[in-house]
Structures are given as C-alpha cells and as structure tokens.
Amino acid sequence: ERNPGAFIEQGCAAAGSVVALDNSVIWLADDFTVRRADGYVPMRISTHAIEAEIQKYSDVSDAVALTYTDEGHKFYVITFPAGGATFAFDAATQLWHERDSRDGDGDSLGRWRVNAYADAYGKRMVGDVTGRVGFLDHDAHDEFGFTVRGLLAGPPIHRDRKNIAMSRFEVDIESGVGLNSGQGSDPQAQLDWSDDGGHTWTDLKPWSGMGKIGQYRHRFVWRRMGQFRERILRLEVTDPVRRAVVRAHTEIDFSET
C-alpha cells in the first residue's frame, strides 16, 4: 500500500527481490544486505556470512525472491541466477539456510530449482527453472525424482584452542523412516568433519543407519574420532526419507596443552 510522503533511505539492488511478507516488505538493498521494513526503518536481517557471499557475485541485479508459509514458518527465499546460489530466511526462527538442487547426474544446479510459488487448488504450487509445475509436499523427499541432499553443519567445537579428544558423538534423528523398497529402504546418515575451520574435510565419512521402516529405537553413534583444537561437524543425508534432527551430544576429554 502506498503511503504518500513516506520515504526510506535505503536503495534496492534487484527489483525482483522485493516481496511482501507478514505485513512487511523484504528486499535486497544496494549495500548487499537483505532488509525488512519495520515501519519506515529498513532493518537488516541478513548475516555477515550471507552478505559476504552476496558480495562475491559479479551481478546481483537479476536476483529474484519468493515467499511461502510452511507449518507456521514464513520463508523469504532469494535466488541469485548469476551467482548460482539460493538463500532462505525463516522469519519464525530468524535463521538462514542455503538451498541447492541437483540434476539427473547428481550434479549441483548451483541454486534451488524453484522459480515461482502460488497457493492454488488447495496446494502450494511451484514452478521450476525448466518449466515444470509441481507442489510442495512433506511426503515427497525428492524434487521431480532428483535427489535432495540434506546437509547440516554445527558451530565450531573448541576449548580455548586446547587439545580435545572426542570419544563419542551421537545425533538424535527421527529413526525408523525407511521406505518399503528401493533407495531409502535402509537410509543412511553420513558424518564428516573439519579441523581447520572448514577449509578441508575428512575423506573418510563413517556411515550410520537411520533405521529401516519401523526401527524407531535406532541410534546414531560415532566413536573414537581423534584429537583436535577446533572442529566443525557436518551431517549429510541423501536418501529420499524424512530428515528430522532434534539434538546432538558428544563426549570429549580435555587436555591442558
């Protein structure tokens, strides 16, 4: 709604990034931040990490955004075609995450394939970059038959840069979600880690089963994971099953050196 005389001292870097969400407006600003209007105040909602990625792109004027609501969570999703990236902001949790789709060979498209969204015919309809039309469905764990890679990275684990020995790591994930047959009948969770700030990751990625259908007491445990001064853990699931991570627990021994 236009308000004669109202003025916000913040430019816009991409016309396609401007969308309405929850009685407000969100857009990509001319300083490479993502802003949300709070009255006439352009509040910054992007993080430094998101902004650092955006500033790497040669062109951001082609950025496009969409919004939708899922189980009470309102999402602002912005895609950078030239930069090859998609970021999503959850207004309920105030957290960002990245989305990436894959082709038939399992290679990354460099962005989320969804290009448009509309509530129609009692469904949450989407259109993808190839012109396909589908809908968002919690019971579908792929995208038009293409694999969806779920990747979750935790915050760095450290103790003032002193040596730490990790003897055990357990993740609480919804288990017993296996399918009746085919890929996903014995779903797996994969763990790797980085001890150098995310520059390199372990080649050996131990697997832990997520439990076949009905195995609800299955546990996800990794042991004897060595020493480090700082570590980032990363969990990956590619099987077409539900991925619900609740919490994680680790047992570590401290050293004074």
Regions found by a protein language model. Name each.
Residues N3-F7:
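A short beta-strand motif characteristic of beta-propeller blades
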Residues E9-T257:
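Beta-sheet repeat architectures centered on beta-propellers
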